[in-house]
Amino acid sequence: MASKDWYKLNFQIESDLEEIIIWKLNELGIFSFSFEYLIKTENKKEVNIWLPINEWDESSRSDFEKIICKLLNINDSINKFFDWSVIKEEDWLTSWKKYWAPELVGNHFLILPCWINLNEEFNDKQIIKIDPGAAFGTGSHPSTYLCLEKMEKILLSDKKVLDIGSGSGILSIAARLLGAKEVCAIDNDYLAINSTNSNFQLNFGNLNNLNTYLGSFNEVILKHQLKKIDFVVCNILAEVIKEMIPNIYKCLRNNGEVIFSGILNSQKDEIIKILIQNNLKLLDVSSRKDWACIYAQKAKNLT
């Protein structure tokens, strides 16, 4: 079977379980998925997940089913709860794209899949063009939405910005659109780095003002001596954020600001406590659905 073929997994959930499924998929590094309301119902959604065949053998798929069953609190012996099918690469490209649409974020941004023409009614928006390929989504996750919503309210003109966990590069692109003079993007997945570079090029025609780094945040800032950052945006999982906070503090200049997202509302108090312990001043907390975004600052009188 061709290595570029895909498994498509389909199942149905109660609509209020969407966020916990998204959280788990992100935790597992799975980014090719969609949710759709079932016809004539508002409380059920159909979940579609695409997984590359060459990376998911029978044992891996079985383990994945058990993870989802545990998450949904259902018996993993239920017949036909999961529907697996095989999608050829050329068919995957068609089936995947049909679930994407332009998305307005905040007051100023429009995330636009690159194969969709811009409607004239959006000419006054800051356009973020995205072609995520096989690995990354188009920014519809609430944590990305919260980051963009907060970023558009922050003065980034002529500032040095660090994007931790860049993924498809949406937040790096947004920072440049908002006037950042330099954007540093870090991700530990080479596919993400490729996607960030590709989408930045798609939006600006070049890679000027962008530096990308492959590796973990703690490794990269030590190796490349990233310092005196004006603004950090960190959209990853809470457990990873907790480990990064001391070094994020060190790489910020005085009065530098940071946004943390990818945090469930139930996790925000613990993150805030760690921020304060590391001499970061809490400025604001916002939320969307089950997710929180924390905005903080390194105070001027701190070293």
UniProtKB/Swiss-Prot annotation:
It is found in: Cytoplasm. It is an enzyme of class 2 (transferase). GO terms for biological process: methylation. One of its GO terms (cellular component) is cytoplasm. Keywords: Cytoplasm, Methyltransferase, S-adenosyl-L-methionine, Transferase. It comes from the Bacteria. Coiled coil: none annotated. Signal peptide: none annotated. It catalyses: L-lysyl-[protein] + 3 S-adenosyl-L-methionine = N(6),N(6),N(6)-trimethyl-L-lysyl-[protein] + 3 S-adenosyl-L-homocysteine + 3 H(+). S-adenosyl-L-methionine binds at residues 144, 165, 187, 235. Methylates ribosomal protein L11. Belongs to the methyltransferase superfamily. PrmA family. PANTHER family: ELECTRON TRANSFER FLAVOPROTEIN BETA SUBUNIT LYSINE METHYLTRANSFERASE. This is Ribosomal protein L11 methyltransferase. It comes from Prochlorococcus marinus (strain MIT 9312).
